[in-house]
Curated annotation (Swiss-Prot):
A matching Pfam family: OSCP
Membrane topology of this protein: Peripheral membrane protein
Record has Metal-binding as a keyword: no
Subunit relationships: F-type ATPases have 2 components, F(1) - the catalytic core - and F(0) - the membrane proton channel. F(1) has five subunits: alpha(3), beta(3), gamma(1), delta(1), epsilon(1). F(0) has three main subunits: a(1), b(2) and c(10-14). The alpha and beta chains form an alternating ring which encloses part of the gamma chain. F(1) is attached to F(0) by a central stalk formed by the gamma and epsilon chains, while a peripheral stalk is formed by the delta and b chains.
Annotated protein name in UniProt: ATP synthase subunit delta
Keyword Transferase annotated: no
Job of this protein: F(1)F(0) ATP synthase produces ATP from ADP in the presence of a proton or sodium gradient. F-type ATPases consist of two structural domains, F(1) containing the extramembraneous catalytic core and F(0) containing the membrane proton channel, linked together by a central stalk and a peripheral stalk. During catalysis, ATP synthesis in the catalytic domain of F(1) is coupled via a rotary mechanism of the central stalk subunits to proton translocation. This protein is part of the stalk that links CF(0) to CF(1). It either transmits conformational changes from CF(0) to CF(1) or is implicated in proton conduction.
Gene3D superfamilies: N-terminal domain of the delta subunit of the F1F0-ATP synthase (1.10.520.20)
Organism: Streptococcus thermophilus (strain ATCC BAA-250 / LMG 18311)
Subcellular location, record wording: Cell membrane
């Protein structure tokens, strides 16, 4: 994404976040953004809205489906996106909106990659430790399995990264032998 487009994405995202806080509608808008992003994930909507050969009217019609079930603030936002012919950046704007909300309330998802599934007790303990060590509030734990780790785990949250996997320890050991 070029700098001009990135600046547009940031401008639209910050505007929606500001409205959410001004109107005390943060939780509503967060939920609506998540629902719209779920639709993006389950369909090829991002590709459709990015197509140059798709008319503005077709893009506007696609966005109107969201407007039927969204708050007035989200409706207005989607209307501005449509009127300014910016549907092609909507996905990136919405992703950034969630990031900005996370930064604002210091709440983040925690991604844990391990060689085998974690028990519920391990997940609970891990969330508590991550919350304390990273000084964040944890929203939820996203668990991924990667058998190539051999053992241990990799934690990602708030742009921080902790790798205690046996694979990385073996790689570090290998580098020290050189």
């Amino acid at each position: 994404m070029d700098k001009k487009t990135q600046a547009l994405v940031e401008q639209y995202a910050r505007s929606l976040v500001e409205v959410a806080f001004e109107q005390d509608a943060v939780s509503t808008i967060q939920e609506e953004v998540r629902q719209i992003l779920t639709v993006f994930a389950e369909t090829n909507l991002k590709t459709f809205l990015s197509q140059v050969n798709v008319t503005s009217e077709a893009k506007k019609e696609s966005l109107s489906f969201f407007q039927e079930s969204c708050s007035v603030y989200m409706n207005n936002f989607l209307e501005v996106i449509s009127l300014n012919d910016r549907a092609n950046i909507l996905y990136d704007v919405l992703k950034l909106v969630l990031e900005l909300f996370d930064q604002e309330d210091n709440t983040y998802d925690v991604t844990v990659t391990s060689a085998s599934p974690l028990s519920e007790e391990q997940k609970t303990r891990l969330l508590t430790i991550v919350s304390q060590k990273f000084e964040i509030k944890t929203r939820r734990l996203v668990e991924k399995i990667d058998e190539e780790l051999i053992g241990g785990f990799v934690i990602k949250a708030k742009n921080k990264f902790v790798d205690t996997s046996i694979r990385s320890q073996l790689q570090a050991f290998k580098m020290n032998l050189k």
